[in-house]
Amino acid sequence: MATISNETPLWRLQQTLNHILPQSVRKNEKHLAVVHGPTQPALWEMTLGELLEFQCLRYRDLEAVVVPWTAARWTYGQLENESSHLARGLLAKGIQRGDRIGVMAGNCEEYVSLFFAAARVGAILVVINNTYTDAELKYALSHTACKLLFIVPRIGRHDLKNALEDLHSPDISKRLPNLNETVMIQGSFKSFGTYKDVILAGNVVPLSAVQRRQDTLSPFDVCNLQFTSGSTGNPKASMLTHHNLINNSRFIGDRMDFTEYDILCCPPPLFHCFGLVLGLLACITHGAKVVYPAETFDPEAVLRAISDERCTALHGVPTMFEAILALSRPDSFDCSQLRTGIIAGAPVPRPLMKRLWNELNMTEFTSSYGLTEASPTCFNAFTSDSIATRLTTVGKVLPHASAKIINPETGETVKIGERGELCMSGYQIHKGYWGNLEKTAEALIEDEDGTIWLRTGDEAVFNSDGYCTITGRFKDIIIRGGENIYPLEIEERLTAHPAISRAAVVGLPNKHYGEIVGAFLVLEPGHTCPPDDEIKNWTRQTLGRHKAPKHVFVFGLDPRLPLDMPQTGSGKIQKQVLRDLGKRLVGEE
């Protein structure tokens, strides 16, 4: 039963009495790098199906989901109705509580309907990365034992014909014994059923059956598996609950001052927390509207959506914003309503931020930090924070969450102002990795008070006001001659050069120093490449000599490189790919 109160049992929140005290920093933690979010507003205790029903009571006739590339415009009432019909179809297909349903598709209204339909019948939706190869798709289906797969023939330029042929082969039941059926969420392929077929199959199932199933569910049930973008080994599937997602998305929307009058343009993909939680659910929890401008990221479609839909917010990673700003805008372009949004996934160069402010009117943009295992957001700036704060920090910890910074070797909490590994605790921490107890035990640690902490693997520092600055990934730190070099400060210096749009700095092997600095660059449109010496001298003007890049590689100019910076499907730069590439190009000197 849905409730909105602050009487949730404390053990469910993995919190002790100390954990929920309202003080930002407690007396016995003075000077230590420990911060606690506010305890108000109270956490919501409901399932995703109950959330949608609850919001329909207030916003039934307001638009909830708009998809310009399919011409879909669904109100809250239509979304509830569509997901109810699909939920009946899932019951007709024999889906039980806890069964896994996979989806691999671009941003579309059917994806949103499936997300809520699966949640309403107690299934776990496995969102599969659009960029996965055939082998990675099969691994995801096998690892999570999906019973149903919803898929499309093509996602942008990614042709899935070979994968579909394999899924249609006679021996697929031997290789994927749990997969009962493949369904085309859009389009068609041979004898596979379609999304509409599933809805038709549900006509024999009464709506009351969906309600009965929904009444058996708990907000603390796992409802979503999201694969982490690990650099080595098979990806891990993070187990996220209704409670995780609903409350995290609420607090994200609160930081952007969302109301039912807001309209979010959301280019990030639905298979990622950015598009699903910070996008879709941040809107649903506030009665706002989400606009998915294209199947995959298309900067021209984003500009059209901002103008045509009168969007008030825009999400993206820095590379998306750079692509948007690189386009010429027609005279009719109107971004006068645009004010806020979240920029995440990578540090934001100051020149880019100035352009977002001046050219797109994003005066209330917010910086953010999160990871899949934390549902995802841990820290988010306020729209009222100063520009300097939003540029140099990721804001303050969200409500009902705690954060601390530890010495990664000793586990001891460091002092405020000292760098260390960021750890998170609170309602938003995932239940672990699906089918991987070993990795779960490595990431989730219990302190002497019985509080569970998630080790993020990210290096961070807190200031005396509780604001957090992410200083890098521990695995990305370059150790040159025994001295730690932090790539982020070099990247920020490089992108301050007028000719450099993006920079990624990695450590390359060196016999004498162990590692040396390598820089991969993308130039600003219309600029010529500065000589290597100029780039090194530019770095040395503000940083130590040893931090200047020994090797410089420029995308678009070096024929040995791909055309653009390698990224994950969610827009994060793949530094492991760059390290491997640099190692092949220069060897070990």
Swiss-Prot record:
One of its GO terms (cellular component) is peroxisome. GO terms for molecular function: ATP binding; medium-chain fatty acid-CoA ligase activity. One of its GO terms (biological process) is fatty acid metabolic process. CoA binds at residues 481-483, 547, 555-557. It is found in: Peroxisome. Substrate binds at residue 372. It holds the Pfam family AMP-binding. This is Acyl-CoA ligase SID4. It comes from Ajellomyces capsulatus (Darling's disease fungus). The gene is SID4.
